[in-house]
Each structure stands twice: as structure tokens, then as C-alpha cells.
Amino acid sequence: MGNGMNKILPSLFIGNFKDARDVEQLHKNNITHILSIHDSARPMLEGMKYLCIPASDSPSQNLIQHFKDSIAFIHECRLKGEGCLVHCLAGVSRSVTLVVAYVMTVTDFGWEDALSAVRGARTCANPNMGFQKQLEDFGKHDVYQFRTWLKETYGENPFNDKDDAKQLLDKHKQQEAAESQSATSSGRQWSSHLTSLSSMSYSNYTTET
């Protein structure tokens, strides 16, 4: 079945194509809405509400045009107290881009912090460079209007999204620090190993006089 969807915010999940067909996982997470974005996106399960967006994982693919519909779909689902799964094929690039745009809209995060927060829950999250540029442009030109639109349309956000996203951001920073420390430690061990080998090699080729 699926490789395991990840909760980003309460009632909001990212997964891959297999997760979107994993009835057990969907039921466990109270998922009633599925946002499907990939080349051949279409409804697959009865009883689910779908938003299907045909889109390739190409840097030139325009995803900004889908941000508003995606954000509305996710937010309306969450306001109902139901779960929403956003998925593409791998749950790495396209789906992550839409969720990052949503996180930016319901918090005051810029695109880099929003992406880092998502990575705190889903370490494989990695939109292609074209999508990252679109998120950067969204943050510069559109996100403030989107925040106003969301509030005027749906009222005050009843969720603690900023606090929840901050926890994920902190988690990601801790993960990065741990990885950096591990890499530094490994580098020192390797350097020590090379020094030891060099010393052994030198002693093997020297003779007493």
C-alpha cells in the first residue's frame, strides 16, 4: 500500500500516489478530501471529494494559477473538521508546492520557512527549482492579498497554524543540526582513519639502520 502520508498541520497531509489509494490510511486519518496533482490526475475512490489538477513536475509548469483553488479546497475541508490529503506521484515536488503555498497563507511564514516547516514533517519534501521560484514570487507579490482574501471569505482562522508550523520549523532545524554534527563527526573519523593508514604505510616502508 502507501509508503506513509505525513501530517503537516491538523487535518492536512502529504502523501504519494499509493497513499491516495490506501483506504486504511485514509480512514485512519479521517480523510474525506483528496487534492490530486500529477499528469493524469483523476478521481479514484468513491465517497471522496476530489480536486484534480493535471500538471507535470516540470520547472516551467505554472502552479501559481492553481494556488487559490487549492488553498480554498484545503481550508474548507479543515474547517469541516475533516482530513485533506494532497498528493502527486512521489509526494515530493508538486504536492509539496501547493501545501507550502497554503502554509504561507495561514501563517506569516516566507516560502523558505514554510518549506522547512513541511520538511520537518516530511523530510523528502523538495519542490523543483522552478516551483521554488514560483513560491518565492508568490511570497513577494501575492501572499498578502491571499491572506486578506482567506480571512474575508472564511473568517478568523480557528487553528493554531502558526504555532504548529513553528514547531515543525524548529524540528527541521534540529534535524539539520544533527545531520551536520553527524557529517562533521564522520569527516573527523575518516580523517583519523586516513592518518592512521598513512602512518602504517610509512612504518611498513621504513627500516632501522
UniProtKB/Swiss-Prot annotation:
CDD domains: DUSP22. Residues 177-193 have a biased composition (Low complexity). Residues 170-193 are annotated as: Disordered. Gene3D superfamilies: Protein tyrosine phosphatase superfamily. The active site is at residue 88. It is found in: Cytoplasm; Nucleus. Its EC number is 3.1.3.16, 3.1.3.48. One of its GO terms (molecular function) is protein tyrosine phosphatase activity. InterPro entries: Dual-sp_phosphatase_cat-dom, Prot-tyrosine_phosphatase-like, Tyr_Pase_dom, TYR_PHOSPHATASE_DUAL_dom. The keyword Nucleus applies. Residues 4-144 form the Tyrosine-protein phosphatase domain. It is an enzyme of class 3 (hydrolase). The keyword S-adenosyl-L-methionine does not apply. One of its GO terms (cellular component) is cytoplasm. Keywords: Cytoplasm, Hydrolase, Nucleus, Protein phosphatase. It catalyses: O-phospho-L-tyrosyl-[protein] + H2O = L-tyrosyl-[protein] + phosphate; O-phospho-L-seryl-[protein] + H2O = L-seryl-[protein] + phosphate; O-phospho-L-threonyl-[protein] + H2O = L-threonyl-[protein] + phosphate. Pfam families: DSPc. Coiled coil: none annotated. Activates the Jnk signaling pathway. Dephosphorylates and deactivates p38 and stress-activated protein kinase/c-Jun N-terminal kinase (SAPK/JNK). Belongs to the protein-tyrosine phosphatase family. Non-receptor class dual specificity subfamily. This is Dual specificity protein phosphatase 22. It comes from Xenopus tropicalis.
